[in-house]
Amino acid sequence: MAILLPDLPYAYDALEPYIDAETMTLHHDKHHATYVANANAALEKHPEIGENLEVLLADVEQIPADIRQSLINNGGGHLNHALFWELLSPEKTKVTAEVAAAINEAFGSFDDFKAAFTAAATTRFGSGWAWLVVDKEGKLEVTSTANQDTPISQGLKPILALDVWEHAYYLNYRNVRPNYIKAFFEVINWNTVARLYAEALTK
């Protein structure tokens, strides 16, 4: 078996006008596909470690040194993007009561959470991701990572992710990342967030 590129759960143009079809096509078919190909190439060198990227990236020191950085970059890139696609929706969804309560407890209000997440996404220098994660105590926190690093490697469980690499927004938003972040909040799939939150509390 090999890691497979997942299909998008909607059409390439389904998120317009917030995320354009050309960006989605390039992002999924080229960028994500490259991470998958490179992760598979690395894993082929060490079949003995298996292909469970979540397990491997939860403890990167167990990854053989000669493929460690490749799996951090490309395995992380695959996991991050596979999650990202699930967290976007053409249909409007609402924050569930459970997630809203957790957000209010952690941040004070939804607006305060949105401000914290926006700040994390805006101030992430260069390429990376902004995250809403569940920590080891089951509490929510906002964080960001560089490049394709995943919060899984820090013992955190991601439930919301925003790709702030320029390839995710530059065709439509040019250098104005804040406008892309604002648009992201229009297409979040809060049903997926709720599912991931429930799973994070039980696993």
UniProtKB/Swiss-Prot annotation:
Binding residue positions for Fe(3+): 27, 81, 163, 167
GO annotations of cellular component type: cytoplasm
Residues involved in Mn(2+) binding: 27, 81, 163, 167
PROSITE patterns cross-referenced by the UniProt entry: SOD_MN
E.C. numbers: 1.15.1.1
Keywords from the UniProt entry: Iron, Manganese, Metal-binding, Oxidoreductase
Highest taxon of source: Bacteria
Name the UniProt record assigns to this protein: Superoxide dismutase [Mn/Fe]
Organism: Streptococcus mutans serotype c (strain ATCC 700610 / UA159)
